[in-house]
Amino acid sequence: MRDRRSTYDITDDVQLTDADSVLKAVCTIFRSAFSEFNENALKQAFDDCERLFAGDYSTYLPCDTLYHDKQHSMDMTLALARLINGHERSVAKDERLGPDRAVIAIITALYHDSGYIRHENDHRHFNGAEYTPIHVSRSADFLKRYLHKVNLGEYAQLAANMVHYTGYEIAPAHIRLPDEKWHVIGQMLGTADLIAQMSDRCYLEKCRDRLFPELVLGDMTVKVDEKGNETVIYESGEDLLRKTPAFYENEVENRLNKLFKNVYTYEIAHFEGESHYIKGLGKNQARLKNVLAADDFSMLRRRPPENYGTRHFPGLEAYLNQHPLKKTEQV
């Protein structure tokens, strides 16, 4: 049996580094779920997303974050389309989401991490990861502008609110949406974001080598209390991995099973009885436990595909020497 390729989705069928391949997969899914849908809006959204990450979108620089790259956004978007299809297959007709909601859901997924991407006139920040604490709010602002631009302005504020299901800036209970169906989509957004990245073939290597530097640049590895006392949360990429099992048990399971109401189970209907994402997530957790039991991080030898960020990032120490960290400020 061929090993799964690092640039492909959980089924090893869709190349995530190619936006056109993901678009074709999403459209195929939606043609099976709906009699018609706004395919032109999806095509434009995928094309614009490709240009945004590449730095070909007006006023924006290329996406330079190491972990939150185009592949992740495409992976998450495809996972969401599959959850939506599974939902439509599983519920009564009056509970179905319908094509209009589904298209807005996909557009929201494509741009859920747009808040990491810097403007051309941003001379205060030198890597998008510095926006980590506020990146979802910046994504919301981008979505509002984008949906107005593509004549879907009636959904602009809704999508801006809904994208917060993918982050921690607003608790899910405080996200305001018009009806329960939109909340179901929000729960799917948050779920797809988690299950896609945590089932990635190179998830563990990416956490150690790419996510940790992002957290450092986002000033997220140290917590400061009211008296100014600092507590180190993550000392290194390896320390991040040591604490990942507890994060999964205490945070991820709570979000998937409670806050997001088990919507991950809709993948079973889409895959006709299979749970590819949850199984992939479990494999990564089992692999991590083996690494931790052996206390041998050299076992993590998979090589994630390069992206713009990895090709241009000088290394964490060199970066910090060149650009001492500053508190984030929205630009």
Label every PLM stretch briefly.
Residues M1-S35, R82-R101, Y111, N151, ...:
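Divalent metal-dependent phosphate-bond-processing catalytic cores, especially two-metal-ion Mg2+/Mn2+ enzymes
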Residues C27, R31, E36-A45, T77:
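Basic/hydrophobic alpha-helical interface regions
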Residues A45-F53, A105-A109, A159-G167, M188-A192:
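Short alpha-helical scaffolding segments that buttress acidic/His motifs in well-ordered protein cores
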Residues E50-A79, N121-A129:
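Active-site flanking loop/helix segments enriched in acidic
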Residues Y60-T65, V91-E95, I117-T132, L143-Y146:
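Short acidic, glycine/Ser/Thr-rich loop/turn "cap" segments at secondary-structure junctions
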Residues H68-H72, L97-I106, Y131-H135, E180-Q187:
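Secondary-structure capping and boundary motifs in well-ordered enzyme cores
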Residues S73, L80, I134-A173, N229-E230:
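Histidine- and acidic-residue-rich, metal-dependent catalytic cores
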Residues M76, V103-R124, S139, A160-E169:
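His-Asp-centered metal-binding catalytic motifs of divalent-metal-dependent phosphohydrolases/nucleases
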